């Protein structure tokens, strides 16, 4: 007997249902999270992960699992997938390459539909990209190496509150790096002695002095006391030198209300710049960036806490991603490495950080760790800050590696000068101006740097003392985050 039309219809619906839905646990790669034929769209958010699969886990399945767990998947198939445009909203791992000279690690390229992310929210972006997926058992270790944020998405962020160009115009300082100093010791000084340090450093020739990351409002010096003494010092130094001076007043606090109060007093006292720490969190950073833009203040970000997740090469997140997120969030300054100082910083990788903060467009450069072309959609530039173990004798190296759009912060290299803080500041200023003059005369200042400094020191006792004290001290430790990015064919295994 032939089947009725109704029976055929039921069978067809059953067939379609079975083809679309399978209960239980299915490999992520078979659920649509792996698609080597996927054509990347200009509007896709792209992420590059360094994946170390657990022993026995196929790298393609590991990449698909990362895509799934950072987008729409859970550990089992759910029938409510049929109520959404699942094929659209699934992240797609579309390329997997073995890391050169490391058979246990793989670069996994993953594309995300733009509609998966709330506009203008770093918190929402990070909840997906670095959320639960980093604790997923299928991967032994996972590191977010780079991202491409599409033009349309970047346009939903305000970007830096002030930017490099406007900052230079406000300070009336052009054609050279800015000079700074972190007050030392970072903890324990009274407000009055703290202000004395600030005055001496600024009067000696520095442009900025700063609070360190953990100076907030402790029993030995409450924040109002510090602000009052510091701004008195800033104003006196500005009057004595005829230059615009500043001090990064750290407004980091336990609550947003308290941060607002501290920032407001800084503004009322005439400060041109305030400071926050990375550890306050992405939402607080964006919130203070909005306040800074609304109140015409420069916003300095200290990357306190960054190395807890960025320093290890196989797990965590590369600092270049933080650079991108912070440019979107709206900070004006961020510590980005010195190359020659005491903190982590491979020269080639650090160059990639500086490009990320300063260029209007990024071009793919695997050696520098830049995996994607990316247009910054006219967002303002962020001023990189170099600090940690640098001194006047390295001035030629600093300018060679870092260029002129940078704040060079000499903490111990100013306050540790045997003749006092003002002499330390003067030594740094004279060294900088001598090197900039040599650069402008088209001299090979990197090679001739030591000679240029010795010549300048003949007319500056403070610089001569600094060179005699620190000589050619450099922290030559091997970086843990070196370049291993070379072009390799896709291994769709």
Swiss-Prot record:
Name the record gives this protein: Ribulose bisphosphate carboxylase large chain
Taxonomic lineage of the native organism: Eukaryota, Rhodophyta, Bangiophyceae, Galdieriales, Galdieriaceae
Gene that specifies this protein: rbcL
Function: RuBisCO catalyzes two reactions: the carboxylation of D-ribulose 1,5-bisphosphate, the primary event in carbon dioxide fixation, as well as the oxidative fragmentation of the pentose substrate in the photorespiration process. Both reactions occur simultaneously and in competition at the same active site. Carbon dioxide and oxygen bind in the same pocket of the enzyme in a similar manner.
Co-factor: note: Binds 1 Mg(2+) ion per subunit.
The reaction(s) this protein catalyses: 2 (2R)-3-phosphoglycerate + 2 H(+) = D-ribulose 1,5-bisphosphate + CO2 + H2O; D-ribulose 1,5-bisphosphate + O2 = 2-phosphoglycolate + (2R)-3-phosphoglycerate + 2 H(+)
Annotated compartments: Plastid, Chloroplast
Active-site residues, Swiss-Prot/TrEMBL: 184, 302
Enzyme class: lyase
Binding site for Mg(2+): 210, 212-213
Entry-linked InterPro entries: RuBisCO, RuBisCo_large_chain_AS, RuBisCO_lsu_C, RuBisCO_lsu_C_sf, RuBisCO_lsu_fd_N, RuBisCO_lsu_N_sf, RuBisCO_lsuI
Keywords per UniProt: Calvin cycle, Carbon dioxide fixation, Chloroplast, Lyase, Magnesium, Metal-binding, Monooxygenase, Oxidoreductase, Photorespiration, Photosynthesis, Plastid, S-nitrosylation
Enzyme Commission identifier(s): 4.1.1.39
In-chain residues carrying the UniProt-annotated modification N6-carboxylysine: 210
Keyword field contains Magnesium: yes
Modified sites of kind S-nitrosocysteine: 181, 460
Annotated GO MF terms: magnesium ion binding; monooxygenase activity; ribulose-bisphosphate carboxylase activity
UniProt miscellaneous comment: The basic functional RuBisCO is composed of a large chain homodimer in a 'head-to-tail' conformation. In form I RuBisCO this homodimer is arranged in a barrel-like tetramer with the small subunits forming a tetrameric 'cap' on each end of the 'barrel'.
NCBIfam families: PRK04208.1
Positions annotated to bind substrate: 132, 182, 186, 303, 335, 387
Swiss-Prot/TrEMBL site (Transition state stabilizer) positions: 342
Subunit structure of this chain's protein: Heterohexadecamer of 8 large chains and 8 small chains.
Cross-referenced Pfam families: RuBisCO_large (PF00016), RuBisCO_large_N (PF02788)
């Amino acid at each position: 007997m032939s089947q009725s039309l109704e029976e055929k219809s039921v069978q067809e619906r059953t067939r379609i249902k079975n083809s679309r839905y399978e209960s239980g646990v299915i490999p992520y790669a078979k659920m649509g999270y792996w698609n080597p034929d996927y054509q990347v769209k200009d509007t896709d958010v792209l992420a590059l992960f360094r994946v170390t699969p657990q022993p026995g886990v196929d790298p393609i399945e590991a990449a698909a699992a990362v895509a799934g767990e950072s987008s729409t998947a859970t550990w089992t198939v759910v029938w409510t997938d049929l109520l959404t445009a699942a094929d659209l909203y699934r992240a797609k791992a579309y390329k997997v390459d073995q890391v050169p000279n490391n058979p246990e690690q793989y670069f996994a390229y993953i594309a995300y539909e733009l509609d998966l992310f709330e506009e203008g929210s770093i918190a929402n972006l990070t909840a997906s990209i670095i959320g639960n997926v980093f604790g997923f058992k299928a991967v032994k270790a996972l590191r977010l190496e780079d991202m491409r944020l599409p033009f349309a998405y970047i346009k939903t962020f305000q970007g830096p509150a002030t930017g490099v160009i406007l900052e230079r115009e406000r300070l009336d300082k052009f054609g050279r790096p800015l000079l700074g100093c972190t007050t030392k010791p970072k903890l324990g000084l009274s407000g009055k002695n703290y202000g004395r340090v600030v005055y001496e450093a600024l009067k000696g020739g520095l442009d900025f002095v700063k609070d360190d990351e953990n100076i907030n409002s402790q029993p030995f010096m409450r924040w109002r006391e510090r602000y009052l003494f510091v701004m008195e010092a800033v104003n006196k130094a500005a009057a004595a030198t005829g230059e615009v001076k500043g001090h990064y007043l750290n407004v980091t606090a336990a609550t947003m209300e308290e941060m607002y109060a501290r920032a407001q007093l800084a503004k009322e006292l005439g400060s041109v710049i305030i400071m926050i720490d990375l550890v306050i969190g992405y939402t607080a950073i964006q919130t203070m960036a909005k306040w800074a833009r609304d109140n015409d203040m420069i916003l300095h970000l200290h990357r306190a806490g960054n190395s807890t997740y960025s320093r290890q090469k196989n797990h965590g997140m590369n600092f270049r991603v933080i650079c991108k997120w912070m440019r979107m969030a709206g900070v004006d300054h961020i510590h980005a490495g010195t190359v020659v100082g005491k903190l982590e910083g491979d020269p080639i990788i650090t160059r990639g950080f500086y490009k990320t903060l300063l260029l209007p467009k990024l071009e793919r450069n695997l050696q520098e760790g830049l995996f994607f072309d990316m247009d910054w959609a006219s967002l303002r530039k962020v001023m990189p800050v170099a600090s940690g173990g640098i001194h006047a004798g390295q001035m030629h190296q600093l300018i060679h590696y870092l260029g002129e759009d940078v704040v060079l912060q000499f903490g111990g290299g100013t306050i540790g000068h045997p003749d006092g803080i003002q002499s330390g500041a003067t030594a740094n200023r004279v060294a900088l101006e001598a090197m900039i003059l040599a650069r402008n005369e088209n001299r090979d200042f990197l090679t001739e740097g030591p000679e240029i400094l010795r010549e300048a020191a003949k007319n500056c006792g403070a610089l001569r003392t600094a060179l005699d004290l620190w000589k050619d001290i450099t922290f030559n430790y091997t970086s843990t985050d070196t370049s291993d990015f070379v072009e390799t064919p896709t291994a769709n295994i």
